[in-house]
């Protein structure tokens, strides 16, 4: 777990409740950790109870108020339970970070099976909409939603084609939801560059690929989970109270134009 100095951050989420999906490792965990350090009661989720339990213990060890819930975002009953359990314990929701994603195939688009196309779309896009349908009635005035997209949404690479297409869709979804949920709820998006997590390990563990990715950035390095958490916390906080419908690309200067 990358360390964030408690002396360097404020308490922008004191008294607030934040749900972060797919948050027991990687970028999702870093986001939950950051929001928790800043005072939020964080609700973390993952498909596996073991992962949830381990992440809860790590966050509690840092003095963070945390609730862990098993949730596969493509399961309607588990989505509803995530929201209902949060509201039952805390009485409200202030922040929702939709981070869950899947990339089960490296096939070219025209060679990808229909069932795989459906799975990637369902988890990466559809689940965010359905989760917010459940959460919306409980969001407080001044609440914030942050969708996690990707730099691949701007130019989907061949090895992540359908994944990239779904991340492009999230850019549009951000705009649509921002208008629909205004004026009481803001909706923004973070598009991370490549970060060496378990999710991206098949790319970043290859030295040649990693070097190529680093060379495409102005800063000549890959991102960290802490980089993504900082940007997400900003957009979710009142510091971004006049920002909605926008995507912040956190990719070290990697070209990001549709």
Swiss-Prot record:
Whether DNA-binding counts among this entry's keywords is: no
Entry superkingdom: Eukaryota
Keywords attached to this entry: Oxidoreductase
Query: Has UniProt tagged this entry with the keyword Zinc?
Result: no
MF term (GO), any: oxidoreductase activity
Q: Which top class of enzyme applies to this chain?
A: oxidoreductase
PROSITE patterns in alphabetical order: ADH_SHORT
Q: Where is the active site?
A: 163 (proton acceptor)
Summarize where substrate binds, as residue positions.
150
E.C. number(s) listed in UniProt: 1.1.1.-
SUPFAM superfamilies found in the cross-reference section? NAD(P)-binding Rossmann-fold domains
Residues annotated as binding NAD(+) are: 19-43
Q: Family assignment?
A: Belongs to the short-chain dehydrogenases/reductases (SDR) family.
- Supply the NCBIfam families for this chain: PRK07231.1
**Function, as annotated:** Has no tropinone reductase activity.
Q: What is this protein called?
A: Tropinone reductase-like 3
């Amino acid at each position: 777990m990358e360390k964030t100095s408690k002396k360097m951050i404020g308490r922008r989420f004191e008294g607030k409740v934040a749900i972060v999906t797919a948050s027991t490792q990687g970028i999702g965990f870093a986001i939950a950790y950051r929001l928790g350090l800043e005072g939020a009661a964080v609700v973390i989720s993952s498909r596996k109870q073991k992962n949830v339990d381990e992440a809860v213990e790590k966050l509690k060890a840092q003095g963070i108020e945390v609730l862990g819930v098993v949730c596969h975002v493509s399961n309607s009953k588990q989505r509803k339970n995530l929201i209902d359990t949060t509201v039952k314990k805390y009485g409200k929701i202030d922040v929702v970070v939709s981070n869950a994603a899947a990339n089960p195939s490296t096939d070219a688009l025209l060679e990808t099976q229909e069932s795989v196309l459906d799975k990637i779309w369902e988890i990466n896009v559809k689940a965010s909409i359905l989760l917010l349908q459940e959460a919306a009635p409980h969001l407080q005035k001044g609440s914030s939603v942050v969708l996690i997209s990707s730099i691949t949404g701007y130019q989907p690479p061949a090895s992540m084609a359908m994944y990239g297409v779904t991340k492009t869709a999230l850019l549009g979804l951000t705009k649509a939801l921002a208008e629909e949920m205004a004026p009481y709820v803001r909706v923004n998006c973070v598009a991370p560059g490549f970060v060496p997590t378990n999710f991206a390990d098949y790319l970043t563990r290859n030295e040649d690929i990693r070097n190529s990715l680093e060379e495409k950035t102005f800063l000549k390095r890959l991102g960290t989970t802490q980089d993504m958490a900082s940007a997400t916390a900003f957009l979710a906080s009142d510091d971004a109270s006049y920002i909605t419908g926008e995507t912040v690309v956190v990719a070290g200067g990697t070209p990001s134009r549709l």
